[in-house]
Amino acid sequence: MKTEHLTNGLFTDYYENGQIKTEGYYKDTKRTGKWIWWNENGQKDSEIYYKDGKCDGKWTWWHDNGQKKQEGNYIEDKWHGKWIFWDDNGEKKSSRYYQEGKLIISSLLSFT
């Protein structure tokens, strides 16, 4: 479906089937606050916070079955702090630590 660029206010984009695809706010033509993406079946895909048009805050992704896929923080469009990754059964796979977008530590969890 056609989308229009907003300078201020709520932005909503839709799939052809009418399901909401993306929703979030613009302020002075920049993304701000919480933005959410869904897949075509209406399942939440990801959620991120923006500040002045840049990713800034917690970002969470989900597997198609609704289990968390990964979660971490951004600061000014860069991965920062602890990021956790899960498999589609909800078991933690790994964690990573970033500082201003650079990987500092990565750890894989043992599988039994």
Task: Describe each region flagged by the PLM.
Residues 1-112:
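Glycine/tyrosine- and acidic-biased, solvent-exposed loop/turn segments at the edges of beta-strands
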